[in-house]
């Protein structure tokens, strides 16, 4: 399996290592030419969603990536990646956040940035993921999914009653960092 790891900012090295440990071949996506390779799975790492969104626009990657996602390319997104994909984004106070043009808007959920607090609010816990109990979950400045906007969005895990991982069509997205729990 060929996994393209978005590598413009954030924890892309950890994401690539995670997929290599699963037996995948990985390569970094940093420029438009990188999208010419065969990609079986596109991954969005954790990091700073505002910076990632700006860089994707500046590098000319935003529209080609959005077209591939909307065309059905499988996507695995973590934390900042979830924020970039969400249909609606709120700031930590629940007010509309980042400009809509800065995110993809392809995943029918509402997310709240930094919902569990800033860096000092980061934590580890265990939970059930996709029916598997006792799965370690690491939350780092994590967003929260505050609303699921389509009936066919599958909730894969929850924390304190809020969805923390979802699957919709070709997109699987996490508020927590599965790549840090292997």
Tell me what each language-model feature is:
Residues 43-44, 77, 174:
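Redox-cofactor binding/interface segments in oxidoreductases and associated redox assembly factors
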Residues 26-27, 75, 171:
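Hydrophobic anchor at the start of a short beta-strand
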Residues 1-71:
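N-terminal beta1-alpha1 cap of cysteine-dependent amidohydrolase-like domains
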Residues 28, 77-78, 166:
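General beta-strand structural signal in soluble alpha/beta enzymes
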Residues 8, 78-80, 107, 141, ...:
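A secondary-structure boundary/capping signal
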Residues 49-127:
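Cysteine-nucleophile active-site neighborhood
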Residues 113-182:
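Amide-donor transfer/coupling interface in amidating biosynthetic enzymes
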Residues 1-4, 103, 170:
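Residues that mark the start of a beta-strand
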């Amino acid at each position: 399996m060929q996994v393209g790891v978005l590598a413009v900012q954030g924890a892309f090295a950890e994401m690539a290592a995670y997929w290599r440990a699963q037996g995948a071949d990985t390569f970094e996506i940093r420029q438009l030419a990188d999208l010419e390779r065969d990609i079986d799975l596109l991954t969005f790492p954790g990091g700073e969603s505002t910076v990632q969104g700006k860089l994707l626009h500046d590098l000319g990657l935003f529209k080609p990536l959005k077209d591939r996602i909307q065309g059905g390319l499988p996507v695995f997104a973590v934390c900042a990646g979830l924020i970039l994909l969400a249909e609606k984004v709120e700031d930590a106070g629940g007010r509309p956040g980042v400009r809509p043009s800065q995110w993809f808007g392809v995943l029918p959920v509402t997310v709240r940035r930094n919902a569990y607090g800033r860096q000092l609010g980061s934590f580890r816990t265990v939970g059930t993921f996709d029916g598997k109990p006792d799965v370690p979950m690491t939350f780092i400045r994590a967003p929260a999914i505050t609303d699921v906007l389509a009936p066919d969005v599958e909730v894969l895990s929850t924390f304190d009653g809020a969805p923390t991982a979802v699957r919709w069509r070709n997109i699987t997205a996490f508020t927590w960092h599965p790549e840090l729990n292997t």
